[in-house]
C-alpha cells in the first residue's frame, strides 16, 4: 500500500498503486501513521497518483459514509499540521480527492506536462468538498470554471497553482528556512484557519452521495472500471 524510504533530509512515502491509490480506509490509516516531523516527499508507483475517494463507500449507509469522510478530514488536518515540509512528486494521473489532497502540501512537482487531473466525481454526484468550500480562497473564478467542468493537464494545473513545477524533483533546490519559520512561510499551514469550512459540505456529500441516483451512477462506473 505504501513504502517509506529515507534519503537525505526527506522521508519518501511511495504509494504502491494498490487499487489505483484510492483513499481507502486502509490507506488513510497508513498515511495517518506517517511521521511528519521530518520532511516528506509523497509520490507514486504506476500510472495513477491517486484515484481519489473510495467510491464503494457510498454504497454503504449514510453513517458509514460520514465516518469515512471525517476520517479523510482528519487526515487533511494532520497534513496541514505537519511540523516539516511536505512535497508531492506526481508521476501519474490524479482524480477527485487526489487533486484536492495536493492543496494541502507545500510544493507539488508534476513529472510531465501530460499528466491528467480531473474532479470527475461530479459526474456521479460525488462533488469535491474542499474545492467547493475553500476553492475561492485558492483559485480564480476562471480556474474553477475549468476545474469543475473538465479534466486538465499538468501544464494547466501549473497555471492554476495546483502544481508548483513540472519536471524532476530536486528537493535540494528548495529553500531551507529554520524550522521555527515554517509556520509563517507555509501556505499549507494557513489553510488550517479555513479547512473546517468544508465540514457542512461533508454532511451534504454524505446525503447526496447516498441518494439512489448517485449510487446507480457509481455502480455503473465501478462496473465499467472492473471490465477494463
Language-model features: locations:
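Conserved CoA-thioester-binding segment of acyl-CoA-metabolizing enzymes
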Residues: 1-45
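Glycine- (often His-adjacent) and acidic-residue-rich active-site loop
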Residues: 44-75
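Short glycine/proline-enriched coil/turn segments at helix->beta-strand junctions
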Residues: 9-10, 34-40, 60-61, 82-84, ...
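Short, active-site-adjacent cap segments at secondary-structure transitions
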Residues: 47-51, 95-96, 116, 192
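Crotonase-fold acyl-CoA enzyme core
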Residues: 78-83, 87-97, 101-181
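Terminal peptide-recognition signature
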Residues: 13, 31, 42, 54, ...
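C-terminal alpha-helix plus adjacent terminal tail
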Residues: 1-7, 17, 49, 153-154, ...
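Catalytic-core regions built around general acid/base machinery
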Residues: 30, 71-83
